[in-house]
Amino acid sequence: MISIAQISDTHLLCPVNVGETDIVKQRINNLKRCVDSINNLDPQPDIIIHTGDVTQNGTVEEYTIADSILKKLKQSIIFTPGNRDNKPNLRKIFTQSLSEKTDKEFYIYSIEFKGFKLISMDTFCSNSNKGELTSSKIKLLSNEISRSKSLPTAIFMHHPPYNVSDNEFERIEYVDIEEVKKFHYFLKNKSNIIALFCGHIHKYFESNIGHIRTFTMPSIATDLSWDKEISKKSKKIQYLLHSFSKKTGNLYKKNISSVVRILKKLVNHDK
């Protein structure tokens, strides 16, 4: 069994740069409350993942604020960059979480524990707030997957590579839809990939890409949440808990979904 706490889209701001506004204080307080809630979980998650947009402007000062809060977590945290992040500054402040694991250009890396694998997929695009999936990135991802094909694998990335619209108009947050189609084809041919964890759209959304379960979570910054009923009125902090467990006595075969149980829980914290 492995348990993962997912947070995303904290969008922290630096008071020095924008003044002591209510939004600055609120976002800092949101993250502090989230950390307190995760630290009070029993049992504790095995690891915490942050699926991007740690800060609003990507400054060292903003990441320093994030670090002062996130270092209070009882368990380790790992990151994948969002469109608002500055990757060199993210690496500079969160050295232990990133520097030895990431490619110089792309933040694509993996960790293995308890018989499972987690892979960060970098969807950052230098000239757009939308995501980018290039052949170079997919090749690096493929290399990470191929190192341990027998392990059930979850990918965490900022931009969800699927339609996130609740209405008839399709909304896919990528600069090149053809890249997304190629990525889907790639994923569907990898039977050991069991889940994608995403952020970016600031609301809870669940879908599938073939056999793969996909989860997109709300923003920790409640003023940016699409779920205004929750964020504005009740001020609840939301994050996701994911648990994977193997069925005893079974070997991993082609249909990985038959031997891995995926549970998700939306946690509302309203102290």
Language-model segment annotations:
Residues 60-147, 176-192, 210, 215-218, ...:
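Extended active-site neighborhood of metal-dependent phosphoesterases/phosphodiesterases
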